């Protein structure tokens, strides 16, 4: 059973894992370096625990202690009980979900390790918005994608905002970082995958025409919001695919486009 420790001083060094959570640049560098990430909210904390992540500590306001009692009773890690005011001073924002947990990161698998057993893979290039990362992981989990590969400059899937938006789906879909870009795509092709680049370009085939759900192994490439895939990535692809649009709309945001594309890749259009 975890020790339940009441903390009244926001400067208490035991709360260091939770300081400055709104400082994106600080947390982006600090969390991977220290091997930690922050899970926020009851559902996300439970999903991280179920996925086998080790908990370093928890930070709770009083009303959440009973809600999380079963988790607390199983933990060897300390649980810090604080007032909402202290929580806000420590983290830099109003913790309206009332529960935070500092989790230990796991070593990432290599891309080749993930590709051995996968058939439907997401490949992201330069997606550096944490909200988009979280949304894409949530859709990938819901729609049956097997794994995610990230270019070296993609945002951290375990950053607090990414985890929160994904509702913990980042714990369900394994991911790895390609060491080089776009050269790293060669290893994906060598593993037997067809590289499909998602683009609104008129030269791309529609998903109905390409029928990726009938292909043996597919790696669907997604670019950043606004810019899309780079020229180098498009050149490296085996084929370009697009989502047909109506009513003068020329594109969707990357999160919405990803969900549509994942359905096309895993299932295809239902037969009428």
Description of each model-found segment:
Residues 43, 50, 107-108, 113-203:
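RNA substrate-binding interface of SAM-dependent RNA methyltransferases
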Residues 99-101, 139-143, 157-170, 231-272:
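Structured adenosyl-cofactor binding patch, chiefly the S-adenosyl-L-methionine
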């Amino acid at each position: 059973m975890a020790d339940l420790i009441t903390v009244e001083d926001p400067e208490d060094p035991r709360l260091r894992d939770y300081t400055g959570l709104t400082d994106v640049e600080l947390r982006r560098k600090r969390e991977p370096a220290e091997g930690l990430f922050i899970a926020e909210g009851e559902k996300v904390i439970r999903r991280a625990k179920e996925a086998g992540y080790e908990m370093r500590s928890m930070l709770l306001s009083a009303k959440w202690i009973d809600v999380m009692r079963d988790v607390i009773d199983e933990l060897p890690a300390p649980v810090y009980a604080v007032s909402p005011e202290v929580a806000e001073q420590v983290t830099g924002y109003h913790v309206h979900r009332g529960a935070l947990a500092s989790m230990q990161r796991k070593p990432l698998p290599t891309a080749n390790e993930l590709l051995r057993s996968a058939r439907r893979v997401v490949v992201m290039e330069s997606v550096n918005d944490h909200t988009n990362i979280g949304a894409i992981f949530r859709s990938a989990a819901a729609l049956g994608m097997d794994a995610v590969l990230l270019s070296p400059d993609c945002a951290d899937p375990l950053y607090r905002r990414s985890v929160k938006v994904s509702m913990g789906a980042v714990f369900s879909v394994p991911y790895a970082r390609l060491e080089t870009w776009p050269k790293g795509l060669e290893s994906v092709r060598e593993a037997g995958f067809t590289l499909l680049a998602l683009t609104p370009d008129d030269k791309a085939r529609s998903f109905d025409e390409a029928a990726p759900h009938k292909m043996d192994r597919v790696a669907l490439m997604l670019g950043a919001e606004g810019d899309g895939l780079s020229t180098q990535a498009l050149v490296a692809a085996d084929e370009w695919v697009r989502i047909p649009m109506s009513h003068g709309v020329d594109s969707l945001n990357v999160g919405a486009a990803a969900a549509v594309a994942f359905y096309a890749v895993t299932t295809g259009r239902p037969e009428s």
